[in-house]
Amino acid sequence: LNEQCLLIKKYAKNQWVTTNYIPNYDEGHIGGSPSLDFQSYTRYMVYGDNEGIGRRGYRVGNPLRIAWANDFFRPIQGTYGVMELQPGQVNWGSINPQPLPGAVRLWMWSVFAGGSDFICTYRYRQPLYGTEQYHYGIVGTDGVTVTPGGREYETFIKEIRELRKHSSSRETKPADYLARRTAILFNHENSWSIERQKQNRTWDTFAHIEKYYRTLKSFGAPVDFISEAKNLSDYPVVIAPTYQLADKELVDKWITYVKNGGNLILTCRTAQKDRYGRLPEAPFGSMITPLTGNEMNFYDLLLPENPGTVVMDGKEYIWNTWGEILNPPADAQVWATYKNEFYEGSPAVTFRKLGKGTITYVGVDSHNGALEKDILKKLYVQLNIPVMDLPYGCLLYTSPSP
């Protein structure tokens, strides 16, 4: 793709070039073409799944699908947009219902709120022949009649014009909002490595990451998915969920970030392999011992029909996919322990101050994300970072001027 971009620019020097990525984050191509002038993605929300909220949620879609894409694409170059946003009913899903009235407009506002610079749709007119005859456009088969989705595009355009009259180009973002700014460190190769050796059929790498991301969005936190090339010091808090592939250079970068005042959260399966997917000739999981102080006695995997329990602050949480039995140093706090099995009472979650910052290690993956949410709540309280408690599906952004 990068070579194609360079070839186009060779002959069309004044033409900008982008592409409409499908946000399949684990495939590794997003952000891999630095010659693109800006990033863009495609997003369809209603196509037969049932990930929305409530009985009719399938008519709106998963409320984090656009948010996650915004937070993933925006940090790459800053300038980004949506090249394909669903205009209405589509043809290619397993079941293709009508979107709920207002859904298209909601999607457009969600894209804009995340900092997008443009929104396009596919397509303008519903086709008369071909494989996508039943795919809506802005206008219908007569080329004149505006479809329901087209009317919502019309409404959004009017609203955004009105909003411009009331906006300021130099509006200051609230201090409490900026204090919550958090990065999620992401490398698709971690997913490649783990998904090929899951060790537990119930393990899901992206479901694990979402437990942290969903919590951050409920906090009203601005979130960036970033690569290792980014400056960690730009963020008060950095989470590296299940970051399996690592090396000394990366661990040293984490240590420097923490010692200089950063607050790092690492989760289970982190730094267990080197960059080539090999287990180091050293105690298992010891690559991050200089950072966390922990030694790993062993890890356990339970049957889903016979899960285990973790306890933190008197509250119990269910787990089965992955649990690490830790041996923490004297200067670490134990935040959560295992309640049952032959390692009952052993640490599962630790917290340690290092230099001017902190390192939290979460060695277990809970069933529903309740443990992960309470850990982040506990941490942000200790850091005096104010958080919100937004219901699922309600997202907070402070956006640049339209």
Where are the regions that the model predicts?
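Active-site neighborhood of glycoside hydrolase catalytic domains
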Residues: 1-17
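A short, aliphatic-rich alpha-helical micro-motif
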Residues: 33, 232-233
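Short, well-ordered secondary-structure micro-motifs within conserved domains or adaptor modules
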Residues: 233-244
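A conserved amphipathic helix/loop scaffold
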Residues: 242-400
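Hydrophobic targeting/anchoring helices
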Residues: 14, 18-211, 298-300, 311, ...
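A short, well-structured beta->alpha microelement
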Residues: 24, 213-231
